[in-house]
């Protein structure tokens, strides 16, 4: 858990800026959390918030449950989008370029491997895709454990290279089905409350998707977290959970994207509760399951734009708000320094 000995001092710094108490709203909470994180292990409170090297990690993986027609897109699209990311043509590339966010793609196990020596591609393949969880376990326990280790290693390496804020994105056809199954199985919420429209399926397809997800969830009762990850998890989701754990271990904040990334964050908090203190939440997505996981994590997202793209786009769009929080904390005058009396 975050050490709180400097919390009052940081709050005093915020309260004594030239503004009414609380006038910057949620930005003040962001500044408090960032300053508190950056004070961990230090001898004094952080008087300056550093956000100089943001890192976006985009985890890609394919899902055997796609065979059940739970998405309107075929699994081949995952590879095509990975190539698009590497070529700089996706929405996430546009937003990362706008805000000077470094983007790295991680192949956790997509159906069609990418033949590329791009420097921003990391290969951590656990297979060509998960098994179809409608009928069998999606992953083995060994794959779950390796995925967690992979995520921890990747995040730790980026932090060692200077990253001071992490953001995670994802790509994988049918990964909303895996995320919904994980959320239902781990939280006990009804399947039909966790399943959403994903890529834009119609009512008939949604009903079918709920039934498919329920088949996997039905095998999960009474299982451990790792066993549930094996039953209905995804390579990219579990790898991402490991990355969340490493971020907390290395005292680095993570700006959390939408539904799938939030489910990975929830998994990480079940495995390591201290992860929660390092999470800031970018946005509220259109996926109905996202409302559930945000509630479970007691999270108040910064944006509500009706996004349902994934890729880390919501996190990239919210990043300037973190910069704004740091800017006022670092540079806004205090009442005393400005000679303002109240």
UniProtKB/Swiss-Prot annotation:
What does UniProt list as catalytic?
311 (proton acceptor)
The record's catalysed reaction(s) read:
5,6-dimethylbenzimidazole + nicotinate beta-D-ribonucleotide = alpha-ribazole 5'-phosphate + nicotinate + H(+)
Which Pfam family is one of those matched by this entry? Answer: DBI_PRT
User: According to its UniProt record, in which pathway does this protein act?
Assistant: Nucleoside biosynthesis; alpha-ribazole biosynthesis; alpha-ribazole from 5,6-dimethylbenzimidazole: step 1/2
Gene3D superfamilies attached to this UniProt entry: 1.10.1610.10, 3.40.50.10210
EC number(s) per UniProt?
2.4.2.21
Look up keyword RNA-binding and say if it applies.
no
Q: Which GO BP terms, alphabetically?
A: cobalamin biosynthetic process
GO MF entry, a single one: nicotinate-nucleotide-dimethylbenzimidazole phosphoribosyltransferase activity
Q: Which domain of life is it from?
A: Bacteria
Q: Which UniProt keywords apply?
A: Cobalamin biosynthesis, Glycosyltransferase, Transferase
Concerning NCBIfam families, the annotation shows: cobT_DBIPRT, PRK00105.1
Question: Mind telling me which HAMAP family this protein's record contains?
Answer: CobT (MF_00230)
* Family recorded in the similarity comment: Belongs to the CobT family.
> What is the protein's known function?
Catalyzes the synthesis of alpha-ribazole-5'-phosphate from nicotinate mononucleotide (NAMN) and 5,6-dimethylbenzimidazole (DMB).
* Protein name from the UniProt record: Nicotinate-nucleotide--dimethylbenzimidazole phosphoribosyltransferase
The organism's taxonomy opens as:
Bacteria, Pseudomonadati, Pseudomonadota, Gammaproteobacteria, Vibrionales
């Amino acid at each position: 858990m975050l050490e709180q000995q400097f919390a009052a001092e940081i709050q005093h710094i915020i309260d004594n800026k030239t503004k009414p108490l609380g006038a910057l709203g949620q930005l003040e909470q962001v500044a408090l959390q960032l300053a508190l994180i950056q004070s961990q292990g230090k001898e004094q409170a952080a008087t300056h918030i550093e956000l100089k090297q943001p890192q976006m990690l985009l985890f890609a993986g394919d899902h055997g449950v796609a065979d059940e027609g739970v998405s309107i897109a075929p699994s081949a699209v995952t590879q095509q989008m990975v190539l698009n990311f590497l070529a700089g043509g996706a929405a996430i590339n546009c937003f990362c370029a706008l805000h000077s966010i470094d983007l790295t793609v991680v192949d956790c196990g997509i159906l069609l491997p990418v033949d590329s020596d791009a420097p921003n591609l990391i290969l951590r393949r656990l297979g060509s895709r998960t098994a179809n969880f409608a009928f069998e376990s999606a992953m083995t326990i060994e794959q779950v454990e390796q995925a967690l280790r992979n995520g921890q290693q990747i995040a730790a390496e980026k932090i060692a290279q200077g990253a001071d804020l992490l953001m995670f994105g994802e790509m994988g056809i049918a990964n909303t089905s895996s995320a919904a199954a994980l959320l239902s199985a781990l939280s006990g919420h009804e399947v039909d409350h966790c399943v959403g429209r994903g890529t834009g399926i119609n009512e008939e397809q949604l009903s079918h998707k709920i039934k498919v997800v329920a088949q996997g969830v039905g095998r999960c009762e009474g299982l451990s977290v790792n066993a549930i990850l094996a039953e209905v998890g995804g390579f990219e989701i579990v790898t991402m959970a490991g990355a969340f754990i490493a971020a907390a271990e290395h005292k680095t904040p993570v700006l959390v994207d939408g539904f799938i990334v939030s489910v990975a964050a929830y998994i990480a908090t079940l495995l390591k509760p201290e992860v929660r203190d390092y999470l800031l939440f970018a946005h509220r997505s259109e996926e109905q399951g996202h409302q559930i996981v945000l509630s479970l994590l007691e999270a108040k997202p910064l944006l509500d734009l009706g996004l349902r793209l994934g890729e880390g786009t919501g996190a990239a769009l919210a990043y300037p708000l973190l910069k704004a929080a740091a800017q006022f904390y670092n540079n806004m005058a205090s009442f005393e320094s400005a000679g303002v009396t109240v």
